């Protein structure tokens, strides 16, 4: 019966693990809904500021802002990598790393260097092992970060761009499609392309007084980049919680299946033990007779 006791101990251990994964699933589901709400609230701001930039830039076409001008000879590029601080979220980070590295290899093939700014401890650990030139790291942002938390890392990258140390800035992050699907992607932040269709067909119900739109454009462009990075961080948190919820749900279900299998093995072992004991009793009784 020692084997049956061992199986019973395993079942008890797996049940305890199942309780933990179930609790983590519920916590992740609650955090995911909150992250989705924050993501939805931040999107209109980013969309509106992009339209205003297009309008202001079009009104001063004679003033080509460096953030709107494509540089001819690209010698070095920068990447802002948005990852998580914690694990247990399936392949969320791994898939992002693969997408980012695939994009980076295109530049490496042309002998173009890269600088990285990383958000999240998982990304920092990976790219330091990978050998990337990590300029700055932002971690421990929590589940509800503020814009101020990412301003520092954005400033590092913009300073590099202003000094012409890098000629383009990209951001690698996860896009929230739905609860089951998170899509890793890399998109360009700078130089920024203005929305020409919005400028040509849009209706503007405001004017600028005094006419300091050049300074306004400078400020708006910086705020826009900050809003894009912040939006990416918020969206990545929603992706993280969704992926963790699904991973913990799968772990809970797998634990249940394993418990059922162990119970079947336990019952067979217990039955075999009882049968053996009965056989021994019968054999002993027969020997006495």
Swiss-Prot record:
Supply the alphabetized keyword list: ATP synthesis, Cell inner membrane, Cell membrane, CF(1), Hydrogen ion transport, Ion transport, Membrane, Transport
Tell me the domain of life.
Bacteria
Primary role: Produces ATP from ADP in the presence of a proton gradient across the membrane. The gamma chain is believed to be important in regulating ATPase activity and the flow of protons through the CF(0) complex.
Primary location class: membrane
Protein name, please?
ATP synthase gamma chain
Recorded hits in PROSITE patterns, A to Z, give: ATPASE_GAMMA
- Entry GO MF terms: ATP binding; proton-transporting ATP synthase activity, rotational mechanism
Species this chain originates from: Coxiella burnetii (strain RSA 493 / Nine Mile phase I)
- Its quaternary structure? F-type ATPases have 2 components, CF(1) - the catalytic core - and CF(0) - the membrane proton channel. CF(1) has five subunits: alpha(3), beta(3), gamma(1), delta(1), epsilon(1). CF(0) has three main subunits: a, b and c.
InterPro entries, alphabetized: ATP_synth_F1_ATPase_gsu (IPR035968), ATP_synth_F1_gsu (IPR000131), ATP_synth_F1_gsu_CS (IPR023632)
Give the membrane topology, semicolon-separated if more than one: Peripheral membrane protein
Q: Where in the cell is it found?
A: Cell inner membrane
């Amino acid at each position: 019966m020692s084997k049956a006791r061992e199986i019973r101990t395993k079942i008890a251990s797996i049940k305890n693990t199942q309780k933990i994964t179930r609790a983590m699933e519920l916590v992740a589901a609650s955090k995911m809904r909150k992250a989705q709400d924050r993501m939805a609230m931040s999107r209109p701001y980013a969309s509106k500021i992009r339209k205003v930039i297009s309008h202001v830039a079009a009104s001063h076409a004679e003033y080509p802002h460096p953030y709107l001008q494509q540089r001819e000879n690209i010698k070095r590029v920068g990447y802002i990598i948005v990852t998580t601080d914690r694990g247990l979220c399936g392949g969320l980070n791994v898939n992002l790393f693969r997408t980012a590295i695939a994009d980076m290899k295109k530049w490496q093939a042309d002998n173009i260097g890269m600088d990285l700014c990383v958000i999240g401890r998982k990304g920092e650990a990976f790219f330091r092992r990978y050998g990337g030139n990590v300029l700055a790291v932002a971690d421990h942002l929590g589940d509800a970060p503020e814009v101020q938390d990412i301003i520092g890392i954005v400033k590092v990258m913009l300073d590099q761009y202003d000094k012409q140390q890098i000629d383009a800035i990209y951001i690698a992050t996860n896009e929230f499609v739905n609860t089951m699907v998170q899509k890793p992607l890399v998109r360009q932040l700078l130089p920024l392309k203005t929305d020409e269709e919005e400028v040509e067909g849009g209706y503007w119900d405001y004017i600028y007084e005094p006419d300091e739109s050049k300074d306004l454009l400078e400020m708006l462009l910086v705020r826009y980049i900050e809003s894009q990075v912040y939006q990416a961080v918020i969206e990545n948190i929603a992706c993280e919680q969704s992926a963790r919820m699904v991973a913990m749900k799968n772990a809970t279900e797998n634990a249940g299946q394993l418990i059922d299998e162990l119970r079947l093995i336990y019952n067979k072992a217990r039955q075999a033990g009882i049968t053996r004991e009965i056989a021994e009793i019968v054999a002993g009784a027969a020997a006495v007779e």
